[in-house]
Amino acid sequence: MSASIISFISAKGGTGKTTTALNLAVAFAEKGLKTLLFDLDPMGSIGFSLARNDREWEGFVEHILKKVPLEEVIIQTKLDNLYILSRGRMAPVDVCSYERLLFSSKVLSNTLYQLINDYDMILLDTPSGLGMVTTAALDTSGFAVVALQAEPLSLRSVSQTLALLERVQKTKNPNLKLLGLLPTMVDGGNPASKSIYHTIVQSFEGVFEAYTPRSALFLDASEKGVPVSFLGGPRTPEMKRFSMLASEIEARLEELKGTTGVQNEYSQRSLI
């Protein structure tokens, strides 16, 4: 076993990047792939998404600063094959030091080296923007997924994001590959959103077919602190979307690497 390490990145906030990483991790795990969701965001976005106080979990910070073994800070969820490495406990005044440490040292690559043979998939949720933590994640990843909200500012930021990927490929990580561009929060009832979505598809190669829609269901899941497929009730298009995206990513990984029965209704569940 050697994990596919995928960074989820976006040049701006509010693109649904963390929601995508979380729900994709669930989709991969439900397909039988042992998956680690690794929260690199100094804001601890994964913890907030799961409705937990960000001081409740030990995580990556405790491992790199206090030498707590990884097996003691990785959370095994109630879903088979899904594990979470949270950001850990960090005061706001320590964010800059955390960012510099990841950017200027090998702590992230050393951590991933310890994990790569234990999982099929390692998903890195990075902070919004193209700063030091995102760059450090790309330095150590095999693949990147770029989240693009279907709105004008995200569209204008694509060139900056692709330029960063190219720079990392040339200077630090020649093995890094762009897995694809993922349109997010596409509003089918909004002509401007639909127009931007079509512009993304027509203007760039590698756009995933399984875009994520703007939906109140994601707000409901966020309020309850669960992935969207854990809400219960009939299996909705939003729930199916991430399974489709996971299959699409698997196919692209197979193409790039040469590697690697659906239920209709669920009861509401908890992940942690």
What kind of feature is each model-predicted range?
Residues 1-272:
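P-loop NTP-binding core
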